[in-house]
Amino acid sequence: IKLADTKTADGGTLSLFEQDGDYSISFDGQELMHSRLNASEKLLGELGLARLKMQSSERVLVGGLGLGFTLQRVLSTIRKDSQIDLVELLPDVIDWNRNHLSKLNGYLLKDARVKAIAQDVIQTIRDAEPEKYDAIILDVDNGPIAMVSPGNDSLYAQAGLSGLFRALRPGGRVVVWSAGPDKGFEKRLKR
């Protein structure tokens, strides 16, 4: 059952579906995520916080809300005095989580540690003060390869990576979800 859909800036259609208590999000008919297949999103949140000192008041940027599984893992890991800037490009996806997905993960948006921001994460990173975040966790598009929206390639280009690392505190961590290995992206990360 289609619960909702919205248009993206490039004219594509993002749709939310429910079937027998399971949810999925598709872009122009291609399934991007499913509530039964959430291990990689949870692992992303876990890896984003791994090896951080977790002393006090961590500041975490989560780019991309989707069905909320990365946010769920981050919230279950960080301290009570931490803050998460949850940045989602499409305001409708935030609304879907609050309304249609409230029982799945939408309740997470009510957590006082979460600030939901409807904005392009690329802009959020550009506008960030230097050394603002302890962790930056990105599940944007399909990662550096197989992108749904070509405009997202600037996030994974050298200038985008420089912005990410500028916004990261010393000892912090950037973790990026990717649909598969990308040797070019790996080389850019090493520069």
What is each PLM-predicted segment?
Residues 1-26:
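N-terminal auxiliary segments of SAM/dcSAM-dependent transferases
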Residues 38-170, 176-179, 187:
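The AdoMet/dcAdoMet-binding core of the Class I SAM-like
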Residues 185-191:
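A SAM-dependent methyltransferase catalytic signature shared across enzymes that methylate proteins
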